[in-house]
Amino acid sequence: MSLSRILRYNQRNNKTTASLTAEHAYSDNWAYSVSLGDPTSVGVNMAAKTGEALNKSYDSVFSSLPVADSVPRTDFTASSRDDENTDVQKLTTSWMEKIDTKMPENISKIDSNIISSPMVSKVEARFIVPKGRLRKNSTDFTSSFSNSLSLPKSYGKLIFFTSKKNSSSTKKNLANDISDNKHNNNSSNTIGHNIPVTTATATCDEIACTSTEHEYNVYEEERMFTTRVYSLEDSVSSLSTNPLDDTYSEAVQVNTRHIEDTESTAHIRKHSYTTSLSSIKRLFKITSFSNNNSNSCDHQESTVADDCAISSSLKETTSSPVSTGSFSLMIENEDSDRDQIIQALYSNIEASTDLVSRKYRDLDVVLGEGSGGKVKLVQRVLDNKVFALKEYRSKKKRESERKYIKNIISEYCIASTLKNPNICETLEILYEKGKIFQILEYCEYDLFSLVMSEKMHYEEICCLFKQLINGVKYLHDIGLSHRDLKLDNCVVTRRGILKLIDFGASSVFHYPLSSQMIEANGIVGSDPYLSPEVFYFNEYDPRALDVWSVGIIFFCMITRRFPWKYPKVKDVQFKAFCSGRGVSSFKDLVTRPATDDSNNYDNDGYEEGVIDMGPNFILHRLPEETHKIMRRILEVSPFRRITINGILQDGWIKEIETCQVVGAASPNEASLRIINKGNHIHTNIDQRYAHIGGLHQRT
């Protein structure tokens, strides 16, 4: 869902700086650079050539990094820079001048959102991270999540699903299962995530009541305890109960099972609950739906209306093996039950809505297009209100239909549950003529187009940046991480309210009633926004990835360019950023533990007058008041990186005046009021170019 852009080089201080402006983006003169929208799927891989030409001695994470004295200052003469006998390569961007910069002819079809992440087998050799050195103390992770069970009632439905008919037997079976597991060493601990393995689950009808406060019971052998689940409409508590603990070193249960030989183990990953948002689907159990279930739907709120329609649909349209069976049991015999599963899933989608063409009128406007599908502008026939319609891509040839449907429904289940002013509302999911559609709240602009317009003022950028932080905080507070934060996945209303979209790559790092931190794995998202640990760690804390991506987005908003193509030492720009840190290798840098001394963060790699390396390689392009917090956000070591709550404690962040939505938590516009701050106005641009789809058409 991104755009191919036109880039040019500007000579400044004897080094090449890549810039992106609307003038160049819409001209016919194309040049290649490491800049916003810089495509990586082109024929000539610039970063690969750079790694071969200038980084032959830095191909491994164990490679040494240049120190401050070995990196040239900006006052070096041209002759000294071109001296072939110099022992140390000059870490500037002048190397670009020597490499072919010709762009391919099919530039209009290149999409920066489809930045091909390297295959796991192609990633540099990973290394074992010593568990003991990565944490300041052995603080129990439970304390970090003591107040994090603030979840909406509909979120409970996604995880605890069974029929009301079997609720009494469920409680008995659950008590027996817990009793057995209590004396079994190979019970829930064998999974590694402290999630009980039981065929019985809590009754969803008991959870999804109309009150803002709900209770559900968990039975043990001799006693019962009650846990309260509060709606997200109430205040959401932070994951970190201590504001001083602003790094991820305290909360992360570091998993040291990293691979050293990627060639032999790249495709032999152990199954876990950390893969993606779609793993929640494993907890879904479709049991028999009786008349009691149908009646109970009438007492549930609109947030779970679709689930009621789904249950009714299964009862009326599916055969008994599907309506009385379980998806988890069908996995063992997927071939024989495949048709029934697909029929049930399709019936679920069709049951909640009418056909697309009956409810919505296509306005023939493409808002964006990417690897996951396309987004179009539609108008509801009932009231002429405008919405965004996401049309999912067709099933790939080698992709099972069951997996294809499951991933889409899993994304919808989570997205439709999120209720926050800085989250784009997901309304419904539809099925028509073999295609799946999702109806979303329409926002007038996307952040990428606003940045491309070059009309944004600094105060407006700061306002949107703080709203982005608030949106990410909301996700982290309920146990979700986005994992694909970028300009393309941020949309803005005409009143200046930023909203996050696209939760297909999201990861659940904390389940209700669990004290375990669930790490994520895999390389997802767009390379320029990824954090370095994603490439080098087998498993990582997804919250730290989100924080890093937030910093990259702010840098792009200020400079209208990417700092690097991807965060690997093969990239000259990133290697310069990692240099001068007082460590001998990149491995030591990315695994540095957290420290109690805040001065170690503020002065780390900071040296006056040196802008060719270290944090100043990035900071000298940003306003001075942002340097302190940006050093913490773009900390190479995830264990030293600041948390999203720590960002909000920064003095500069606190002083930012941000536009906000006040009123009821419901997305109903009639009950909401937007307060715009008087120190800035929000940019308005031509609607023809307000979205990436329009920019595509212009080029």
Curated annotation (Swiss-Prot):
Residues 184-193 have a biased composition (Polar residues). Its EC number is 2.7.11.1. The active site is at D484. SUPFAM superfamilies: Protein kinase-like (PK-like) (SSF56112). Residues 168-193 are annotated as: Disordered. ATP binds at L367, G368, E369, G370, S371, G372, G373, K374, V375, K390. GO terms for molecular function: ATP binding; protein kinase activity; protein serine kinase activity; protein serine/threonine kinase activity. Gene3D superfamilies: Transferase(Phosphotransferase) domain 1. It catalyses: L-seryl-[protein] + ATP = O-phospho-L-seryl-[protein] + ADP + H(+); L-threonyl-[protein] + ATP = O-phospho-L-threonyl-[protein] + ADP + H(+). One of its GO terms (biological process) is negative regulation of conjugation with cellular fusion. Pfam families: Pkinase. Residues 361-653 form the Protein kinase domain. Induction: By the macrolide rapamycin in a TOR-dependent manner. Keywords: ATP-binding, Kinase, Nucleotide-binding, Pheromone response, Serine/threonine-protein kinase, Transferase. Belongs to the protein kinase superfamily. Ser/Thr protein kinase family. Protein kinase that functions as a regulator in the pheromone-induced mating pathway downstream of mitogen-activated protein kinase (MAPK) FUS3. Diminishes transcriptional induction of genes in response to pheromone signaling. This is Serine/threonine-protein kinase PRR2.
